[in-house]
Curated annotation (Swiss-Prot):
GO BP term (any one): pyridoxine biosynthetic process
GO cellular component, one term: cytoplasm
Lineage of origin: Bacteria, Pseudomonadati, Thermodesulfobacteriota, Desulfuromonadia, Geobacterales
Residues involved in a divalent metal cation binding: 171, 215, 270
GO molecular function, a single term: metal ion binding
Cofactor note: Binds 1 divalent metal cation per subunit. Can use ions such as Zn(2+), Mg(2+) or Co(2+).
Assembly mode: Homodimer.
Pathway(s) where this gene product acts: Cofactor biosynthesis; pyridoxine 5'-phosphate biosynthesis; pyridoxine 5'-phosphate from D-erythrose 4-phosphate: step 4/5
Protein localization: Cytoplasm
NCBIfam families reported for this sequence: pdxA
Enzyme Commission code(s) on record: 1.1.1.262
Protein name (database record): 4-hydroxythreonine-4-phosphate dehydrogenase
Family per record: Belongs to the PdxA family.
Amino acid sequence: MPNTKPRIVITMGDPTGVGPEIIAATLAEPEVRQCCRFLVVGDSAAMARGITVAGAALRVERTDTLNWEESKEGVLPLWEISSLTEADMQYGCPTVASGDAMYRAICEAARLCLEGNADAMATAPISKEALNRAGHRYPGHTELLAELAGAERVVMMLAGFRLRVTLVTIHEALADVPRLVTFERVLETIRITHRDLHRYFRRNPRIAVLALNPHCGEGGMFGDEEARIIAPAVAAARQEGIDAIGPLSADTLFHFAVQGAYDAVVCMYHDQGLIPLKLLHFDDGVNVTLGLPIIRTSVDHGTAYDLAGTGRASAESMKAAILMAAEMARVKGSGGGTP
């Protein structure tokens, strides 16, 4: 019988951070090895060092063919895209070479997915500074992947088993948020959230849409974005058959969301969504890029230079990202989620 386990390609992230070691720790776990077939895109020296730091019973095996065989016991299959020197891999000291290696790993993984040679990609954390020093001017994974995939609008979703949040604005100064919360952005965020939750998680997702201001603006006393922008966007989404409700006050909504009343919460700005998400899922939260033609999940943390090489970095978010990518690929392959 053909092997139907999802094919997950994993990028090594910043070789001077915790990426290689949390990947090694994750891929040594039977639960992960049994749920999917996997291939790491990265540097063999960096991954071998990561295996040692993690104390994983694995060895790197380089490959240049995509046969997607069942992963051999004790083997970490690697698609090599760089040959970093020891100087390029000093912990906490990203270089131009390491920044270029991160970029090439992301591009190669995206290419494999876009060409149908992998079912999903899961990414380890990168250094945005090193990426830019290497001449690749992107704020992060999301913007680079959107360009590679030709996606006009993407949405960041942070997810755990108790809560999913999506963001209308992401890395913006709080003072700029009211100007950036537009009817078009709110409606498009609701649409993409609905479409991809339908595609990868549930057939009929129920979506809560948060207010921007305290108490939904209190009838205009604390701002009018709710009446002028958010409520019309929710009404337009409902006209399209989307089960969206809002605007709702953020100070009470999350109490009901974590009890399962909603499948996702659309938030107006970064901290409005990430504070409750990280309160619940600090170790095992997953970053998912919605709006792409491919599945991309990632850890919900950074390079953690202070922990790199110590063996103390938690691999729970990396594990959750790979497991979620595999589950999303399975649901997509079966034609959609279940009600």
